[in-house]
UniProtKB/Swiss-Prot annotation:
Protein name stated in the entry: ATP synthase epsilon chain, chloroplastic
Subunit field text: F-type ATPases have 2 components, CF(1) - the catalytic core - and CF(0) - the membrane proton channel. CF(1) has five subunits: alpha(3), beta(3), gamma(1), delta(1), epsilon(1). CF(0) has three main subunits: a, b and c.
Taxonomy of the source species: Eukaryota, Viridiplantae, Streptophyta, Embryophyta, Tracheophyta
Keyword annotations of the record: ATP synthesis, CF(1), Chloroplast, Hydrogen ion transport, Ion transport, Membrane, Plastid, Thylakoid, Transport
Family: Belongs to the ATPase epsilon chain family.
Length: 11
């Protein structure tokens, strides 16, 4: 549930 947020913020 952290890498998902990381990918979302990377966008």
């Amino acid at each position: 549930q952290i890498i998902e947020a990381n990918l979302a913020l990377r966008r």
